[in-house]
Every structure is written in C-alpha cells, then in structure tokens.
C-alpha cells in the first residue's frame, strides 16, 4: 500500500491536519507527525540548539518539539523502516500564495520531503472563518492520486491553495504561477502590562500581481490553485548579465 507522511505547521492538534489525515487514510497508509505547537511562519528552519522530543498521542499522531522541517526530517529518517512514498503538508489555516511561500512552514515541510528525494504536496485553505477543510481534503486526495500516476520532476513540489467554499461551489482546478504582494505593512507598536514597548508584525501587503494565471486570481475566482514550485532558486536568466560585471571587479 502507498505510504504517506502527513505533517503541517499549525501544530499537531490543528483541525487541518486531522481532516487531511482522515481523508488520506481511507485510501493509503498514513503516518501523521507534526509540531507540538503552532509554527506558522517557520519557513525551512531547523532546530539546532536543542534535542527533539516526541510524544505519541492517543490518536496515533506523533508530536515533535520542533519545526515542520524537523518533523518531516525526523519522521523519514527515524520512523520508517522503508521511506514513505509521498509527503503531504497541511491543511494550512490560511493562504500560502505568492511571496507567502517563502515564509510558510507548510510549504517548507513539503520542501523537506523533496530534499530527501520524495514527491511532496503542500495544501492550504484560503479565506476567513475557515470551515471547509473537507473541501481541501477532497482535493488533496485527488491531487495525491494524480501525482502517483504522473510524477513530477525531482526538484519540484506542488503548492495547492483551496478556496474556503463548499465542495459543490468549487469551479475547478487551475495550474498557476505565483502572484506577488506589495511590501508588508509596518510593525504594530504597543506596550505590555509593565509599560515596556513591544512590537507585533503588521499585516501582509496587498496583492500586487493577482492577474489571470496567478494563484491569487484562481482562488479569488473560486478555483483550486496548483502551483509547481522548484527547489532551485537560481535566477538563471541573470547569470550572464551579472557574470559580465562581476568578472571585471
């Protein structure tokens, strides 16, 4: 039977990871390993200064005192006699589109699976008052089945964003590119109860490139967005231009 490792960045008790695990378990052998707390925005960070501790929960899930990347790395290296076939990360509570992908622990967990040589998918539910995790789980199962039948390149993952809509209101699936946001808003300056100055991150920037073909556009119009992401961040088209002046230094 196909073996799937499920992880996330919202934490092992988040509703999204349960919805995803339960849906996939109807068709595949599933192991669920996630952080013991919310690690949203953790990106690809690893825990290097402390040991990782694990705790097996009553439902069979395994919590880890680390980041999403830690969870996937640990699970693949230590919890399987034979590696899983696919890594699926999610279902994230909120969008991972455009620039968000660089900060996302959800995307990072999938990337770690890819770094270790496995096909991987990150899936997120987009909207306010999130409640349609079943819709995202349904599409996760469909996309996993498609990935099994039609593998993608070894340096890529699929980043999936699903509108927060009932299943019968989804218009279809679109293969997209990443959109882009304007610069993030400023910090929020406050005082703690002792009168000391503290800062919170402000809201993300508004959508700058949400044109047709982007993930932003697809989701805003009721479509599931599937964006292939590459692990290699090299801007190949810039190499000749930069090489010209670098070699003159």
Swiss-Prot record:
Catalytic function, reaction form: a ribonucleoside 5'-phosphate + H2O = a ribonucleoside + phosphate
| Entry keywords, A to Z | Cytoplasm, Hydrolase, Metal-binding, Nucleotide-binding
Q: Where does a divalent metal cation bind?
A: 9-10, 40, 92
Q: How is the cofactor bound?
A: Binds 1 divalent metal cation per subunit.
Q: Which cofactor does it need?
A: a divalent metal cation
The molecular function terms of the Gene Ontology recorded here are: 3'-nucleotidase activity; 5'-nucleotidase activity; exopolyphosphatase activity; metal ion binding; nucleotide binding
Q: Check the record and name the InterPro entries matching this protein.
A: SurE (IPR030048), SurE-like_Pase/nucleotidase (IPR002828), SurE-like_sf (IPR036523)
Q: What does this protein do?
A: Nucleotidase that shows phosphatase activity on nucleoside 5'-monophosphates.
Q: Does the keyword Acetylation apply?
A: no
Tell me the compartments it is located in: Cytoplasm
EC number(s) of the enzyme?
3.1.3.5
Q: Which NCBIfam families match?
A: PRK00346.1-3, PRK00346.1-4, surE
State a single Pfam family of this protein: SurE
Chief location: cytoplasm
- Keyword Cytoplasm listed? The answer is yes
The cross-references to Gene3D superfamilies, in alphabetical order and at most eight, read: Survival protein SurE-like phosphatase/nucleotidase
PANTHER family attached here? Answer: 5'-NUCLEOTIDASE SURE, 5'_3'-NUCLEOTIDASE SURE
Q: Which GO terms describe its cellular component?
A: cytoplasm
The beginning of the lineage is: Bacteria, Pseudomonadati, Pseudomonadota, Gammaproteobacteria, Alteromonadales
Q: What is this protein called?
A: 5'-nucleotidase SurE
Which protein family is named in the record?
Belongs to the SurE nucleotidase family.
């Amino acid at each position: 039977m196909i073996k799937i490792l499920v992880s996330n960045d919202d934490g092992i008790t988040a509703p999204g990871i349960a919805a995803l695990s339960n849906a996939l378990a109807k068709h595949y052998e599933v192991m669920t390993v996630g952080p013991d707390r919310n690690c949203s925005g953790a990106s690809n960070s690893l825990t290097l200064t402390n040991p990782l501790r694990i705790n097996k929960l009553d439902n069979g899930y395994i919590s880890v005192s680390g980041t999403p990347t830690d969870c996937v790395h640990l699970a693949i290296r230590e919890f399987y006699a034979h590696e899983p076939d696919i890594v699926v990360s999610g279902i994230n509570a909120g969008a991972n589109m455009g620039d968000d992908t660089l900060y996302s622990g959800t995307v990072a967990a999938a990337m770690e699976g890819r770094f270790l040589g496995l096909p991987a998918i990150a899936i997120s539910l987009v909207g306010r008052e999130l409640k349609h995790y079943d819709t995202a789980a349904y599409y996760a199962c469909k996309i996993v089945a498609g990935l099994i039948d039609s593998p993608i390149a070894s340096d890529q993952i699929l980043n999936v964003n699903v509108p927060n809509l009932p299943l019968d209101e989804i218009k279809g699936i679109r293969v997209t590119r990443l959109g882009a946001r304007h610069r993030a808003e400023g910090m929020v300056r406050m005082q703690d109860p002792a009168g000391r100055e503290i800062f919170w991150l402000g809201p993300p920037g508004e959508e700058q490139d949400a044109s047709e073909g982007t993930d932003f556009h697809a989701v805003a119009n009721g479509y599931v967005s599937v964006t292939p992401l590459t692990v290699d961040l090299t801007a190949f088209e810039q190499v000749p231009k930069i090489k010209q002046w670098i070699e003159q230094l």
